[in-house]
Amino acid sequence: MSATSSWYFPNGSLSAPNQPLALDVKRAGWTYCGIDVYSFSAKNKEIEIDLGNREAVVVPLSSMSATIKHHDKKYELAGRPGVFAAVADWFYAPAGSKFSLAAESGEVAVCTAIATKEFAPHHGLASSVPVEPRGAGFATRQVNNIATPDSFAAADRIIICEVLTPGGNWSSWPPHRHDGIAGCPNMNEEIYYFRIGKQNSDHGDAEGRGYFHAYTVDKKVDDTITLNDGDVYILPAGYHGPSIAAPEYPMYFLNVLAGPAQDRTMAFCDDPSHHWIRDAWKTQKQDPRVPMTSASGRVNNS
């Protein structure tokens, strides 16, 4: 089955000059979340960003470094050659910020959420990002908890994490939702920004393939997507999972979440048909390929 909803955006369908990805709330057709990915080169080394009523988390994807000038302070972010190469530094910019973002080359993500409260800017070090092996067996994956409620409290609505899945494994499993309907009290919009690698690649590869399933409670949306590197899927509602990494094609996705709750939360409701899987993990070992990366680079688990 192919995509039947308007929630799937193939790579390039949301591009702009020097922006492989430009997704705001208007284009998404919802209230809170957005993401921009900027591409830097000799002809485009610096951009100016005005957040207005949004807060943001800046994450280098394939830039070795990025410089942020926020008011009278300069922040030097340690980057990486690609999302499969290492964990990177990150930066939180509060609502109302105007700042410049500069890099010599590569891509940098600016994740946003509508905000009503203002917090202080923050430079997060890669070495301080909690790296969590999650799941077990063929559902073992790595979660980099960049700006989650537990890892970073000083934000209004935005929640950011990265998930890396070894080739042949599943993530987003069991299927779960956080749409505030049909008995699930938790409400967050969510963006999935996918990069599909190739064996031993630092970043995404055009040959990479993966798979993703999403469906609503009423089954009016039931999408099974063949993913290419750089694709986006947005989730205003419904169950999502699994995200499947094909053998030898590791999968990365950057999640951006935000919702109306006064207190940020990552709570969700499993599909009751598959909740039992969490108990099955108790008797399974985690895949030794996880974690795949750290602040220092690739993790050698051989």
Q: What are the residue ranges of the model-derived segments?
A:
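Conserved metal-binding segment of the jelly-roll/cupin
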Residues: 84-104, 113, 226-247
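A short glycine-rich, His/Asp/Glu-containing loop-to-beta-strand
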Residues: 14-48, 141-191
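Accessory, usually C-terminal, subdomains that scaffold auxiliary metal cofactors
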Residues: 212-276
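Glycine- and acidic-residue-biased ligand/ion/polar-headgroup-sensing regions
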Residues: 47-75, 167-168, 179-232, 243
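Short, structured patches in soluble enzyme cores that scaffold and shape functional sites
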Residues: 95, 103, 110-115, 147-150, ...
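Extended, compositionally biased flexible segments
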Residues: 33-102
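Hydrophobic, proline/glycine-rich low-complexity stretches
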Residues: 2-48, 55-65, 278, 284-300
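Double-stranded beta-helix
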Residues: 106-148, 247, 254-302
